Structures are given as structure tokens and as C-alpha cells.
A protein has these predicted regions:
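Structural motif
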Residues: 41-43, 50, 66, 75, ...
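A hydrophobic/aromatic-rich effector-binding and dimerization subdomain
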Residues: 2-10, 70-130, 152-160
Length: 170
């Protein structure tokens, strides 16, 4: 699956299951990324450190992270966006581009998803896919809302994993 939207203000949002084959997205150093292994494994190099990700593991990366896919042993999904698409809008601090998932830490946020967490994210991805087929003047805003829902869901999962109280992420 491959979807990419560029807005009039140079905002970008993309979803792909073939990030390792898309040189355009790989070269774009402005993108925030979620990489989610759906089945099998994925070897990813982030800032010269190789990470072996397994089924239902997800990482969130900022534009400052240098990432290369080293080995694909299954199916994965990459959700990407830049600050012109999402971050220029006023968002609550915990779900912003400076929030809990993208707080600039040198450590990569790595999440292991439970079946119920995976199902919640699957439903958001399905909604995103459906919206990709609707070409109208509301699509950009709808995709922004879907992205925010994805980020909020991931933030809740990370809070639970790291036992962080709401509002205490920073």
C-alpha cells in the first residue's frame, strides 16, 4: 500500500508498506515516522545502531533520526508526516511534534503492541485507507484528524508501557 499527499503549504503525509523501496521518502529529511512491524521481522538502522524489530513492535522517529531499512522479513507499515502537515497547527503538548513520542530524546521510543492495541491501530489505518480514496476539499483536514488519532493512541500505549501519568510526559 502506498499513499502520499502534498499540500499547498508543502505539508506531507504518507503511508507505505514499502518504505525501503521508496527513495523519495527516504531522502526527505523533514519527516516524522512511525515504523510498525505487522508480521515477521524488520532490521532497521537508526543513527548507526541496528534494531531488530519483531511482529507488533513499533518505533517513532523524528526528522533528526537517520534511518535505513537493512532487512525485511515480513510486512511492515510506515506512517510519515512533516511539520508543515501536522506540527504547525496548535496541538496539546503531549500529542505535538515536541510531545511524548517525539520529545527529542536520543533514545528511540520502542513499543510492543498487545493484540487489542494492534486492533485499535488497525482500525485507524483502515479509516486512513478509506479516506485516501476520497478526493475532495475536505481530505487534507480529515487526514490530519486521522493522524492525530493515531498519535493519541500511540501516546496512550506509550504512557501505559512506561507507566507515565497523563500530563507528566515532558
Amino acid at each position: 500500500m502506498e499513499y502520499h499527499l502534498r499540500t499547498k503549504l508543502n505539508g506531507n503525509i504518507a503511508m507505505t508498506s514499502c518504505f525501503h523501496e521508496n527513495s523519495f521518502l527516504q531522502r526527505d529529511r523533514s519527516l516524522y515516522k512511525f515504523i510498525w512491524v505487522r508480521h515477521g521481522t524488520l532490521d532497521v538502522e537508526v543513527d548507526h545502531v541496528v534494531m531488530h524489530l519483531e511482529k507488533e513492535e513499533m518505533i517513532s522517529l523524528t526528522p533528526l533520526h537517520h534511518v535505513q531499512i537493512r532487512g525485511v522479513g515480513g510486512e511492515y507499515l510506515t506512517f510519515l508526516f512533516n511539520s508543515n502537515f501536522y506540527c504547525i497547527y496548535r496541538h496539546d503538548s503531549e500529542v505535538s511534534c515536541n510531545g511524548f513520542l517525539f520529545n527529542g530524546s536520543s533514545r528511540v521510543m520502542r513499543l510492543k503492541l498487545s493484540p487489542s492495541q494492534s486492533a485499535r491501530l488497525d482500525s485507524i489505518v483502515d479509516i486512513f485507507r478509506g479516506e485516501c480514496g476520497i478526493q475532495d476539499n475536505l481530505q487534507e483536514e480529515m487526514l490530519r484528524i486521522i493522524l492525530k488519532r493515531f498519535i493519541i493512541t500511540c501516546t496512550r500505549i506509550a504512557r501505559e508501557k512506561f507507566d507515565v501519568d497523563p500530563g507528566r510526559e515532558n
